[in-house]
Amino acid sequence: MTKVITRFAPSPTGMLHVGNIRVALLNWLYAKKHNGKFILRFDDTDLERSKQKYKNDIERDLKFLNINCDQIFNQLSRVSRYNEIKNLLINKKRLYACYETTEELELKRKFRLSKGLPPIYDRASLNLTEKQIQKYIEQGRKPHYRFFLNDEPISWYDMIKGDIKYNGKALSDPIVIRADGSMTYMLCSVIDDIDYDITHIIRGEDHVSNTAIQIQMFEALNKIPPVFAHLSLIINKEEKISKRVGGFEIAYLKNEVGLEAMTITSFFSLLGSSLHIFPYKSIEKLVAQFEISSFSKSPTIYQQYDLERLNHKLLISLDYHEVKERLKEINADYIDENFWLSVRANLQKLSDIKDWWDICYQTPKIGNLNLDKEYLKQASELLPLGKITKDSWSIWTKEITNATGRKGKELFLPIRLALTGRKSGPEIAGILPLLKREEIIKRLVAIT
């Protein structure tokens, strides 16, 4: 049986966003599910926009999300190979030179649209005489090259969308070599997929028409195309996600929102599938449950709130030994197991635990809360004697109710505010043993 090999091929022209990290995750998961290989390829043929900084950022983000790459390469290192295939396809008359300027092509496009015709290239360059070509050369024009698409049906089976059919006549011959001699993504990608034995390609549905074109490129090179799967796009506020829309970058979700790696990995590995989005603690468990057939054809809605809520669920589920190393990473290795278990249910992000440590072990900022001083003084006098434990709260509240008649919010909110300066937070029963008797009385009396 052929070994499964997948790839993730970002252009290093910006930071990873939620749309392309989802593609990376699903390709990685599919490869690992089938004991295969995952390749990272940088599509860096756009010399003007591709930056080494973005390559570094992409590798950093993948590492953060526990996506390990079995192989990494960039397209710039393979230019001689691309030129070899370029010459082969020119000789086979599947690549042809064109001399139109950008302005001329735009005029042609507008003209066809005005006539109700699809804006595809008219292949005028195929009818140029030697004299016309020589004139263009004398004018200083340099040719760009297009791939000649056969006017025949193109069909394939998609792992998500099922049977897909295109008519070659409805597609425009794509530019594969620019006038400056640089290669576009379209042909380079096919050459790489052939040379690196890529068996499966999972990508966004905005690439469906590219797939139709690339299938003819595979066939022109006498190769069998990989198996394709096209994911529905991630939609936020009726817009598809792109690297040019701010706030969706992985670095932002990690550093600004404070999300855990497994929150992001769990969410985007399951988003758009029929499987329940669950905060997995390890990526190995995600691999075990992954099924490409579970993904829907329908558009996928993304809301950052859902990610933040999942992060909260993940933190609640983590035992101390599972979070100890992460606490060191955020310089909070002073947090012990007892404190973690007492406050984890109230953490939206891991760094929140520092705030709760400060609240418990430094004087909280109470502000002008206009609390009932007489009530707090009376409550301090009713605090149970002896060592403060989690059971002390229930004993204390009974004493307060018997003495004052207060219950519920009227009873606990003034005490919570006096002790923590917050209207919400961890169960007071768990906070009391952390504060201890002297500090509890001190904070209640300080209000009075």
Curated annotation (Swiss-Prot):
UniProt GO cellular component terms: cytoplasm
Residues spanned by motif 'KMSKS' region: 240-244
Entry GO MF terms: ATP binding; glutamate-tRNA ligase activity; tRNA binding
Residue numbers binding ATP: 243
GO BP annotation list: glutamyl-tRNA aminoacylation
Entry's EC annotation: 6.1.1.17
Enzymatic reactions: tRNA(Glu) + L-glutamate + ATP = L-glutamyl-tRNA(Glu) + AMP + diphosphate
PROSITE patterns, alphabetized: AA_TRNA_LIGASE_I (PS00178)
Domain of life: Bacteria
Enzyme class per UniProt: ligase
Residue window of motif 'HIGH' region: 10-20
Main subcellular location of this protein, as a coarse class: cytoplasm
Places the protein is found: Cytoplasm
Keywords of the record: Aminoacyl-tRNA synthetase, ATP-binding, Cytoplasm, Ligase, Nucleotide-binding, Protein biosynthesis
Function statement: Catalyzes the attachment of glutamate to tRNA(Glu) in a two-step reaction: glutamate is first activated by ATP to form Glu-AMP and then transferred to the acceptor end of tRNA(Glu).
Self-association state and partner proteins as the record states: Monomer.
Family designation: Belongs to the class-I aminoacyl-tRNA synthetase family. Glutamate--tRNA ligase type 1 subfamily.
Name recorded for this polypeptide: Glutamate--tRNA ligase 1
Organism: Rickettsia typhi (strain ATCC VR-144 / Wilmington)
